[in-house]
């Protein structure tokens, strides 16, 4: 069905087709921990990371080190002179990629002796957790409205950074002269 997610589809296929294994190519598994535990065949998740998988899961994942790569991006912003760096982060309940990327941001600031100002962290709404241009735009508008000072912004997704750029340009900000922007994902 339309509202069916990756885990629902997998559980259905296991039952119908008697699968012996599954490979997930991405997906959003944040709200599915209890249902993930019901998958009784080995599975691999590509391009998604888990901080913790349910016990007794026969699972592996293939992903980059989101924490380290985020830290490298924020390190670069710090090394180019930025001391007030905002982040467009995932929702507060995210325990996967978004959490790891936020941890990398925090680690980089601390490593450069900079304070982590919670006012510069803009979280996705829990109702709509997609890393989209629309959400990046909305989040940047929200950050600008707070009048929190920042010279750079790191978005945890390239799609979000595109939306953020649109919001910055609408407010008359020049990129990178007024605000440097950096995104994550390697979008072409």
Language-model segments: residues:
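Short beta->alpha connector loops
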Residues: 2-4, 24-30, 159
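Conserved nucleotide-sugar donor-binding subdomain of glycosyltransferases
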Residues: 1-6, 118
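Bacterial carbohydrate/catabolite-sensing allosteric modules
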Residues: 9-15, 21, 33, 37-188
